[in-house]
């Protein structure tokens, strides 16, 4: 953890808009989205790229991107070739794990300034011919969707999607279709208000895309204003004929990136960098793969204990809505005030680019704390395979 004498701090943050599947950001690779977020975060910090020593970037679906995606993002952002780059894959927790690794490296004195974040273009995840290394020989073959295989399917029950496990947890906690839809409707309303009011302005950096029509600039989250709350109760269940989980009360397949510039407080003061927040604690939890939807609860409890905080001490919470039921479980088990949870909407409305979301919710949490006069925040994500990460931050 950060030492009281010289805590690890966040000096800037930036994220791209969240793009829909095959939507506004389809023309950009994950590494290009990552480069956009990194460049903006560096510029907002007012730090020379020559002082950045390392970069950690989450990316869950690297197939087809080429060597070292994090390195590509760093070079694309204009960072010096001397910057060491590491690509992080911890499923949906990848972006937050990048920040955790940056924190620990800074606390250990391994570096003075590190960029951490995540990036994903689920739109551009390729299909795979898994048997063609040795040749199909004869007859038909099968293509595998790398987005499903490496991102959305359970590794221990081949072919079973994450949503099927979410159905199981909804049944266990007795959250029916009506309750999950009500959560999704409320979240969509919050996200739509945030988009139209400019609440995300402190987070978002525009993305410039070259298309057949010319150069286009994407400057706001794509999906909230396209969604119709009235249609949510009419949608068919997505994972079980009689289930309650639908496309609306699940996160949507998305594209996007986010980045934070992190250092130690003493370094920030020496260089005159703006200190936005300090990292108070971080934690992780792992248990049965099929129970991944519940893993944020113990991870958050651990992070709270390390911070010396009670739930009531926290001003705002960001719990990634891989499915609405994930945040609903955390709210119920921890006794979170619903007015403090995902106040600008969550992934059900905004989208969930899996390698980026861990960094995205940190950006959103800090931005919301600033806008609402809060100070203490806690963010967490469930992770396929039965894990979760959590990070507590405090505005300075």
Regions found by a protein language model. Give the residues of each.
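Conserved active-site "lid/cap" helical segment
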Residues: 2-65, 69-77, 81-84, 165-177, ...
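N-terminal extracellular/periplasmic Venus flytrap/periplasmic-binding protein-like
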Residues: 9, 15-16, 26-35, 44, ...
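Flexible glycine-/small-residue-enriched beta->alpha junction loops
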Residues: 113-169
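Beta-strand segments within the central parallel beta-sheet cores of soluble alpha/beta enzyme folds
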Residues: 50-58, 85-89, 114-118, 179-186, ...
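Active-site pocket-lining segment
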Residues: 165-167, 200-203, 209-211, 280-349
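Active-site-proximal alpha-helical scaffold in enzymes
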Residues: 88-120, 170-199, 259-266, 331, ...
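Conserved catalytic cysteine-centered active-site region
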Residues: 59-113, 156-162, 226-252, 333-360, ...
């Amino acid at each position: 953890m950060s030492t009281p004498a010289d805590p690890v701090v966040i000096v800037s943050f930036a994220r791209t808009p969240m793009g829909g599947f095959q939507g506004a950001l389809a023309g950009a690779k994950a590494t290009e989205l990552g480069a956009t977020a990194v460049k903006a975060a560096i510029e907002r910090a007012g730090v020379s790229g020559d002082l950045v020593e390392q970069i950690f970037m989450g990316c869950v679906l690297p197939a087809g991107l080429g060597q070292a995606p994090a390195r590509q993002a760093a070079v694309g952002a204009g960072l010096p070739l001397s910057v060491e780059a590491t690509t992080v894959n911890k499923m949906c927790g990848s972006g937050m794990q990048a920040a955790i690794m940056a924190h620990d490296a800074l606390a250990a004195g391994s570096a003075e300034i590190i960029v951490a974040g995540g990036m994903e273009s689920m739109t551009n995840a390729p299909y795979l011919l898994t048997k063609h290394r040795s040749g199909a020989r004869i007859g038909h073959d099968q293509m595998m969707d790398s987005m499903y295989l490496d991102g959305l399917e359970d590794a221990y029950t081949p072919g079973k999607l994450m949503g099927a496990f979410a159905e199981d947890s909804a049944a266990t906690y007795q959250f029916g279709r009506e309750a999950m839809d009500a959560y999704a409707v409320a979240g969509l309303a919050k996200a739509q208000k945030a988009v139209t009011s400019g609440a995300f302005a402190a987070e978002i950096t525009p993305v410039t895309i070259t298309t057949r029509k010319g150069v286009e600039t994407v400057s706001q989250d794509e999906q909230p204003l396209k969604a119709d709350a009235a249609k949510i109760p009419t949608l068919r269940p997505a994972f079980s004929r009689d289930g309650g989980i639908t496309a609306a009360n699940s996160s949507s397949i998305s594209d996007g990136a986010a980045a934070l510039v992190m250092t130690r407080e003493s370094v920030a003061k020496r260089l005159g960098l703006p200190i936005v927040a300090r990292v108070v604690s971080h934690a992780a939890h792992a248990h049965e793969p099929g129970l991944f939807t519940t893993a944020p609860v113990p991870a958050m409890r651990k992070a709270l204990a390390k911070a010396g905080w009670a739930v009531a001490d926290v001003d705002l919470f960001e719990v990634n809505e891989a499915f609405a039921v994930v945040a609903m479980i955390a709210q119920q088990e921890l006794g979170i005030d619903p007015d403090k949870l995902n106040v600008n909407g969550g992934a059900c409305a905004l989208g969930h680019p899996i390698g980026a979301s861990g960094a995205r919710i940190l950006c959103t949490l800090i931005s919301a704390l600033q806008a609402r006069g809060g100070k203490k925040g806690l963010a967490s994500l469930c992770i396929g395979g039965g894990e979760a990460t959590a990070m507590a931050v405090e505005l300075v």
